[in-house]
UniProtKB/Swiss-Prot annotation:
The DNA-dependent RNA polymerase used for intermediate and late genes expression consists of eight subunits Rpo30/OPG66, Rpo7/OPG90, Rpo22/OPG103, Rpo147/OPG105, Rpo18/OPG119, Rpo19/OPG131, Rpo132/OPG151 and Rpo35/OPG156. The same holoenzyme, with the addition of the transcription-specificity factor OPG109, is used for early gene expression. The keyword Zinc does not apply. One of its GO terms (cellular component) is DNA-directed RNA polymerase complex. InterPro entries: DNA-dir_RNA_pol_18kDa_poxviral. This is DNA-directed RNA polymerase 18 kDa subunit. Keywords: DNA-directed RNA polymerase, Early protein, Nucleotidyltransferase, Transcription, Transferase, Virion. Its main location: virion. It comes from the Viruses. The lineage of its organism: Viruses, Varidnaviria, Bamfordvirae, Nucleocytoviricota, Pokkesviricetes. It catalyses: RNA(n) + a ribonucleoside 5'-triphosphate = RNA(n+1) + diphosphate. The keyword Transcription applies. It comes from Vaccinia virus (strain Copenhagen). Belongs to the poxviridae DNA-directed RNA polymerase 18 kDa subunit family. Induction: Expressed in the early phase of the viral replicative cycle.
Amino acid sequence: MSSFVTNGYLSVTLEPHELTLDIKTNIRNAVYKTYLHREISGKMAKKIEIREDVELPLGEIVNNSVVINVPCVITYAYYHVGDIVRGTLNIEDESNVTIQCGDLICKLSRDSGTVSFSDSKYCFFRNGNAYDNGSEVTAVLMEAQQGIESSFVFLANIVDS
């Protein structure tokens, strides 16, 4: 995983009942709820600091809500194709094999190996190596996929040990 820090404006929408004396708290909560730990366009905001030293630009009324661009210092995280990651192998059935790596989900394609069911548990076979469901494996990221809520998703292949 790689990361970078940038200054930018994050756009949030506030409802009329949120425009009270607690507006700073409501803005902070809206920014965190909308952007923090959410995968958007291949990157995820891991840390957000709202800049108090910069004035807020005027809001815009859109459909009975107020859209505000909030000045922030944002630390983003992202993964590259070719990154090597380690995680837990999760086999739900023959067609759903994933590796869970914290904020990353690696999907294994059918041609990555074969799934077998023996002794009341699933096993994944690749190049003569057997990997039990729940075992720690290493994978190389092959292709980025559409993220899910708060996770990156990549197609990956297991690296043979």
